[in-house]
Amino acid sequence: MRKTRVTAAEVAKLAGVSQPTVSRVFTPNSKVSKEKQEWVRDAAQQLGYLPNTLARSLNTGRSRTIGIVLAYLKNPFYTEALEKLSAGFRAHGYHIMTFFASNMAEDVDEVVEDLLAHQVDGIILASVSMSNTLTGRLQHYGIPFVLFNRGQPDRSLASVTAANFDGGRRAAEFLVAGGHKHIAHIAGWQKSLNGRERRAGFLAGLQEAGLAPFHVVDCHYRRAVAVEATRNLFSGPRVPDAIFVGNDHMAFAVLETLREDLGLSVPGDVSVVGYDDVAMAAWKTFDLTTLRQPANRMAEATVSILLSMIENGAASPGRIEIESALVIRGSARIPKGLTRNA
């Protein structure tokens, strides 16, 4: 059994090409004819050749590795988004390193320091906070980064989010059009710009209709907190006739609480609208009307922006907002003139 590593020179000899050609075949985006690529890959497979990515990174000055920092995967939206991001970067010959951190800026700073030690080419911060100190360090070292699904007050930073204010307003307009007068909001974490903007859009939509919110409560994107908030909303003599929930993850908990714990009919007694349109929203169990946060389009935009910054030295495009479409199912009363669209 052979114990020594197969070399590029051996592959080149068997394939009948030069050694630099072998290197180019295994370097993403290098120009090599399709015929020579087939020769080299066939020879590599026969010999059991494995490209030396470390050596290539030393030659090119790039690791072809992207670091992704996430706060959690409990929300199905992030599971889908991570899959889309990984596939997008793999298609361009990049590998992914995933790190987890809490939403505290200090924890994120520490994790990013680890990523920098791994010589990543770029960083995606997915729904986590970052300090001004970290922003300055990344800019100082010339490490491109994109904020995914997390806006920052500094709109010059590269970020990709849903149009959260508009989405919140559309949720309010839809519920008002359905004849609801007492609309509550189980809001997302108010220390995140996304949560604040969805709340602000919702309140603006109600104000335009001459309505005040029944009640607004920050549930931190946590199911258990959303369950408790739902019970509290229905514990007194006055109750809401509709609830806009800051994301689907919490909306599922709200629906279960309304139906199973409180014995209420949805949408007969109360309408529910979520935000994200994760796959589970279409399940018959939930049949959730929601605002679609398009993970695929957001991931495509994020990949494109970060690669342009890495490979072309492109400047930050600032904040990119992608429209959230209203997906009408069966958890909310449907206004006249509208129909289910999913």
Locate each region found by the language model.
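N-terminal helix-turn-helix DNA-binding module of bacterial transcription factors
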Residues: 1-64, 333, 342
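Short beta->alpha connector loops
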Residues: 102-105, 126-131, 249
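Short beta-strand segments enriched in small/hydrophobic residues
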Residues: 14, 19-24, 58-74, 84, ...
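Bacterial carbohydrate/catabolite-sensing allosteric modules
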Residues: 1-3, 46, 84-95, 132, ...
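Amphipathic helical "hinge" segments at domain boundaries
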Residues: 38, 47-114, 119-122, 200-203, ...
